[in-house]
């Protein structure tokens, strides 16, 4: 029997995730997932691709606040879901969308830890960022994700990969929202629809893996090749395990 093993949220794109027992789903995907994002001085989005130390910042939901914890720095809090803000336009993968500015203090906190000028911005409900229409026929939207509201991995797929690696890697490297157990290795490759309780999900496409999979989540440093290089001459080398899904 295939079971939902864990649920992970990423309140701010690129930071460490939060494991939760349950979550609500809104128009953007999992509630509170990637509604915050860091941008540089040109309002271009930032991720672990440029700043691998981002993964060392651990968010913590405390009521209506998002508490940020980083090694060697005092914790900092920002509103989890701001009710208002100064509008600005940000760029993510070449797309322009509306965002709200955070306080200057918040920008200083991130800049001090990451060693690069940056500041957090929030995606309000009024902002619209559509998923790729080639894979979504229902005008689905998403937050500051790489492209789709949900990412799914099977535990068996990671176990299969780790048998081929000299040093096993952790699930955290692949940053899934939904982790399933009880499936065969790479069974998610064949899934078209997924039912979790009363919610039905459409499997959109494999998710191409990027440099983020080479970031050691415990050290915040790049460490070697993409783990899926163990599948040479195989589409899985680029689309390892993880599935982009809609609801």
Pin down the residues of each PLM region.
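Metal-cofactor-dependent catalytic cores
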Residues: 1-247
């Amino acid at each position: 029997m295939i079971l939902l093993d864990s649920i992970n949220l990423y309140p701010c794109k690129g930071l460490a995730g939060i494991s939760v027992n349950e979550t609500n789903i809104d128009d953007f995907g999992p509630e509170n997932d990637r509604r915050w994002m860091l941008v540089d001085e040109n309002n271009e989005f930032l991720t672990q691709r440029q700043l691998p130390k981002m993964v060392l910042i651990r968010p913590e939901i405390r009521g209506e606040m998002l508490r940020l914890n980083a090694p060697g720095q005092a914790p900092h809090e920002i509103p989890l879901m701001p009710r208002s803000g100064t509008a600005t336009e940000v760029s993510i993968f070449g797309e322009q969308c509306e965002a709200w500015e955070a306080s200057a203090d918040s920008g200083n906190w991130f800049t001090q830890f990451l060693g690069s000028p940056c500041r957090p911005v929030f995606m309000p409900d009024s902002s619209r960022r559509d998923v790729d229409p080639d894979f979504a026929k229902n005008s689905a939207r998403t937050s500051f994700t790489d492209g789709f509201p949900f990412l799914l991995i099977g535990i068996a797929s990671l176990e299969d990969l780790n048998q081929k690696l000299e040093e096993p890697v952790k699930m955290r490297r692949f940053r899934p929202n939904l982790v399933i157990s009880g499936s065969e290795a790479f069974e998610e490759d064949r899934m078209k629809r997924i039912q979790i309780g009363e919610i039905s999900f459409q499997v959109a496409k494999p998710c191409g893996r990027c440099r983020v999979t080479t970031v050691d989540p415990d050290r915040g440093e790049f460490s070697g090749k993409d783990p899926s290089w163990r599948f040479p001459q195989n589409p899985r080398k680029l689309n390892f395990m993880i599935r982009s899904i809609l609801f």
